[in-house]
Amino acid sequence: MSKLGVLLTICLLLFPLTALPMDGDEPADRPAERMQDNISSEQHPLFEERHGCCKGPEGCSSRECRPQHCCGRR
């Protein structure tokens, strides 16, 4: 039984319980901070408000902007 106690003591010294994240440290518990860190799509420089259109250097000719509804095409 003393071997188990020694092993437990060594494990707790090498990996203390304070190293584990607690429930309060989860980002899901802090939505206000999570929203400040997250860049929404409206603030992204390559996003145009028209349903996912790009306005980067390649414009609608890039592969990401090929939908028919993009950039005024119907």
From Swiss-Prot:
Tissue: Expressed by the venom duct.
Name of the protein in its database record: Mu-conotoxin-like T3.1
Family membership: Belongs to the conotoxin M superfamily.
Keyword Ribonucleoprotein: no
Residues in the signal sequence: 1-19
InterPro entries to which the protein is assigned, alphabetical: Conotoxin (IPR004214)
Residue numbers bearing the Cysteine amide modification: 71
Entry's free-text remark on domains: The cysteine framework is III (CC-C-C-CC).
GO MF assignments: ion channel inhibitor activity; sodium channel regulator activity; toxin activity
Species whose genome carries this gene: Conus tulipa
Keywords: Amidation, Disulfide bond, Gamma-carboxyglutamic acid, Hydroxylation, Ion channel impairing toxin, Neurotoxin, Secreted, Signal, Toxin, Voltage-gated sodium channel impairing toxin
Main subcellular location of this protein, as a coarse class: secreted
Modified residue annotations for 4-carboxyglutamate: 58, 64
Record function comment: Mu-conotoxins block voltage-gated sodium channels (Nav). In vitro, this synthetic peptide displays a low blocking effect in mouse extensor digitorum longus muscles (IC(50)=616 nM).
Disulfide cross-links: 53-65, 54-70, 60-71
Pfam families: Conotoxin
Coiled-coil regions listed: none
GO CC list: extracellular region
Propeptide: 20-74
Highest taxon, organism lineage: Eukaryota
Subcellular location: Secreted
Location of 4-hydroxyproline modifications: 57, 67
Species classification: Eukaryota, Metazoa, Spiralia, Lophotrochozoa, Mollusca
